[in-house]
């Protein structure tokens, strides 16, 4: 069976297509599936200074049809939507009475150069959501922003299918992706909790080094506000802080003031600046004329904002303005849901706050005992250094279930390879795998510390279990597992400007039954967009305040009184972004949550024909106790020629143990031609006292033809439970051993005086009946249905009682899924005894009679020879 890890949208061949509307955009979602996964994606983005956030949850009921993958109608519910538009850092400057020439000479305008055009957001077609883009008009310069939009498409379709070889993959890139099987079709789903996009952001010149004087003592902050104090960071949630500031007295170029964040909060979100000197550029504070009043940066390590005044402020005083900055969770310092202190220091003045993080759970999957469960999160994207790296955390089996034949696929795309900038390959991707000791200690934020004692690195054990044979896909064979694993991904994306889309998939079966194929998937996407902002710093011009904060006082009053409450503007209709000169402020918080599920069960039926040839090996254990006293006078001359031909073909198994203690005196001349394999171990205790003088002339010709029927009775108790799936023809040759135990007690007393010259001819036809009793106890694991037709021939020449030992028979492991036909056949054979074909009583009498005649003849012969010996003496 071939499975595929993709699906293409808008393919109506044999798949149902549903139309639904999210926000103001209508999109079509087609559920053609690679790997059996119906991806239902969403978009999200984050803003640094100008941010729009919307959250939508979509859910659907389970649906299933034979060999048809249908995506149910999604019921779209718009949740609380808050839009913060055009948050702009601004300043208003009151100047002292100076000449215009002086003011002009001390005033400069600094604008960062921009050489690249602003990347336009890549349209995400045929998805479950459409991101709204805010149209912002900036007078002179646009600063980068990160739009946050989150959509949750929960489309759970659980299917029990009977699929063979679920790990087989096929990854064509151009044809519709399907997954089907003659015995069932899997219809999983993908949950997309948060989607982000990533466009290459051109590095922005950082703020000037703070070489001047710290003027925190001259800066007063007021009207501090948090946009919200509770949100879900795993659903692209974040908040904004807004405050007014006023500079008392005069400052000069190079002077600066600071703002510091607490441990539980960050200003960069999930954008990684570790390759950019851990410094993130912040939008400049500008005047209405576009003059840069102050340049700002954010230090990732110290969580400190630094606002450095430019020479614009020289010879000016009473500068006042405002700023609004996005705040995100610190996944390492706030790993669990809860309320954290968020006390923010602005210009050495503390503003006490508390923020509640309501992380959506990373433990997600199919709600069945053997259901696949996996989730992932992009926790860091380098947008500034040009190295184009990202970091991703994957939780494998977070529900800690017992799963069989588990495979995990980490993809650098979702629907189509050409629609993502992700690069997954042996050279572009580094994987580290950890075994989790205590699943309850996993973070809600997807943060995983490699040095955590709760994580045991087992990457070396997967050296030969990681492959990249499919384009842009890493395949990991976890096999049979009952523990949770964390996979840390260090990947790359290209410079095409496309969104970074990733997908993780887990598939497995129920190890107890070998059926119930289950699959679950998870989507992530990152987008960094560009926005703009403006500010005012010239006292001669009334500022325009596009931000939802307190307005800047346009008049040069010594005590400006700003409005106490920021009021956000109405949400604009989604229109394409203009192409401003980008000064990126890529603050993004990357989180996503997606899942796909499917279940399938398989049952196999096989017919088998079996031919068996058996070769018997008989082992006889005889014990006789003979006490004879004879006085015989005979003269015999015996010439015996015996030709014996025995052929035994028996289906039995025996072990023989014999101990022989024999005290005998015999003289025999025999010629035998025997085609049999016999191992005889006799235990005989014979005490014979014979005084025989015999003279006999005997000519005997004997022909013996024996035919034996073997009657075996076996009792077999087998318990089988197996994972088998095949059609097989088997031929078997069996060697059997028999164990016979015979005991005879003979007491004869004879006295004879004979002189004979006999000429005897005997024709002997013996029929022996062998009774074998075998007790076999076998235990095996098998779950199969098979019809077995076996034909065996057994022909044995033996006079024995066979008691084979207990045989423990165990069904062999069946890695390829073939049905073990021997279980059922052997069980039937062991419980049905062979029919009796001989007459036991007659055979026994004939045997005793032959033994007595042979004994009498030997006594007469012995006596005759003894007598001849005496006469010669």
From Swiss-Prot:
**Signal listed as a keyword:** yes
Q: Which GO terms describe its cellular component?
A: extracellular region
Q: Which SUPFAM superfamilies match?
A: Bacterial adhesins
**Per the record, which residues fall in region Disordered?**
44-192, 530-845
Pro-peptide positions on chain? 838-873
Q: Where is the composition biased (Acidic residues)?
A: 554-797
- Say yes or no: keyword Secreted present: yes
Q: Name one GO biological process term.
A: cell adhesion
Motif YSIRK-G/S signaling motif: which ranges?
A: 15-26
What UniProt notes about the protein's domains is:
The Asp/Ser-rich domain functions as a stalk to allow the ligand binding domain to be displayed in a functional form on the cell surface.
What name is this protein filed under? Clumping factor B
